[in-house]
């Protein structure tokens, strides 16, 4: 194995800035997200922005079986811990992850009530934070919940929400994750995203200004984007004050508008095969700011949801192992081609 350059020691022996290392530094061990469906909707579906939703969107494909809005947050946390302990058996700490749809799409007072059900799970038994005696525990009493992650759209945050989360993070870990998907406005319009990239930039900068950890999701392979365009996006993303990024290869989900377009005009789409994607995403990582944590290189959903062909039914861990092996073979790492005169590794 080719030694990691000495100036990349902060990668902890890997060739990219990994999510697991980030949370090991934060909490001293592996941390696993527990998805929670708190019954949120989306302005791109209910008519406020649009009624069609994003053409690629299928929330059911990403929701684990226990994650249902008719269940209380306490029950979902409890069942989520059990689910992940059976499946992974590696995590000893968990994040309550408000994932499906837009999890800031309610008035602030309602949001406080929802989020604090998860905060109370931390307060009940966690020794890591001081108790919040002003609240009565309604959620799972477990020492394993260490914080929350809130997934939402970049056009659904404002100063009042960020001020509230800024206060909360003095005693609890909080992260906001934005669905950005592309840096190109023409792409965002084509997939009916309902906002432009400038909106995402503004939200990310506002979040960072409040000192709140911030993540962003991007999809590789959206129609209309060439490989050069996608790689050039690394230079744009690298200038954002992001804590984490999550990458997904385009997958076509059954029942979506994009599935209809794909079946009618497959020539409009370039779907990566596994080997091509591995090299592509490494090329991308080479140009990415090494201070940005990579949560995921690729998406993983059950094949039954897909119109497009899955990658030999490989689990994400197997895909990641292949990516890291290829990085070793190419003797490369995240940020190798990143250029920023102000950056000091």
Region annotations inferred by a language model:
Residues 32-36, 94-96, 148-150, 174-178, ...:
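Hydrophobic faces of well-ordered beta-strands that scaffold small-molecule active sites
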Residues 198-258, 275-298:
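Conserved C-terminal portion of the radical SAM core fold
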Residues 1-21, 27-32, 244, 252-345:
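Auxiliary Fe-S-binding modules of radical SAM enzymes
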Residues 1-53, 59-92:
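N-terminal [4Fe-4S]-dependent radical SAM core
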Residues 85-87, 118-122, 163-173, 205-209:
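Acidic (Asp/Glu)-rich catalytic clusters
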Residues 108-116, 158-167, 230:
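Distinct, well-ordered alpha-helical segments
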């Amino acid at each position: 194995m080719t030694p990691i350059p000495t100036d990349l020691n902060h990668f902890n022996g890997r060739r990219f800035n990994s999510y697991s290392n980030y949370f090991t530094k934060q909490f001293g061990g592996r941390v696993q997200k527990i998805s929670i469906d708190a019954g949120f909707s989306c302005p791109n579906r209910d008519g406020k922005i649009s009624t069609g939703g994003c053409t690629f969107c299928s929330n059911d494909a990403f929701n684990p079986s226990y994650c249902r809005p008719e269940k209380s947050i306490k029950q979902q946390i409890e069942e989520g811990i059990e689910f992940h302990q059976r499946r992974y058996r590696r995590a000893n700490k968990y994040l309550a992850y408000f994932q499906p749809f837009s999890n800031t799409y309610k008035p602030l007072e309602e949001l406080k009530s929802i989020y604090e059900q998860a905060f109370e799970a931390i307060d009940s038994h966690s020794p890591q934070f001081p108790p919040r005696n002003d609240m009565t525990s309604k959620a799972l009493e477990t020492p394993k919940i260490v914080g929350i992650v809130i997934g939402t759209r970049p056009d659904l945050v404002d100063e009042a929400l960020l001020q509230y989360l800024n206060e909360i993070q003095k005693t609890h870990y909080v992260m906001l994750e934005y669905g950005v998907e592309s840096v190109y406005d023409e792409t965002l319009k084509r997939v009916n995203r309902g906002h432009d990239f400038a909106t995402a930039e503004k939200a990310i900068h506002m979040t960072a200004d409040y000192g709140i950890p911030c993540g962003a999701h991007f999809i590789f392979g959206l129609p209309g984007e060439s490989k050069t365009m996608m790689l050039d996006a690394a230079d744009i993303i690298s200038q954002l004050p992001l804590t984490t990024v999550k990458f997904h290869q385009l997958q076509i989900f059954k029942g979506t508008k994009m599935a209809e377009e794909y079946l009618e005009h497959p020539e409009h789409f370039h779907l990566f095969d596994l080997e091509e994607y591995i090299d592509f995403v490494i090329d991308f990582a080479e140009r990415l700011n090494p201070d940005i944590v990579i949560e995921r290189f690729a998406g993983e959903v059950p094949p039954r949801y897909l119109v497009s062909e899955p990658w030999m039914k490989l689990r994400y861990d197997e895909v990641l192992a292949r990516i890291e092996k290829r990085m070793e073979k190419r003797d490369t790492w995240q940020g190798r081609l990143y250029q920023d005169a102000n950056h000091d590794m």
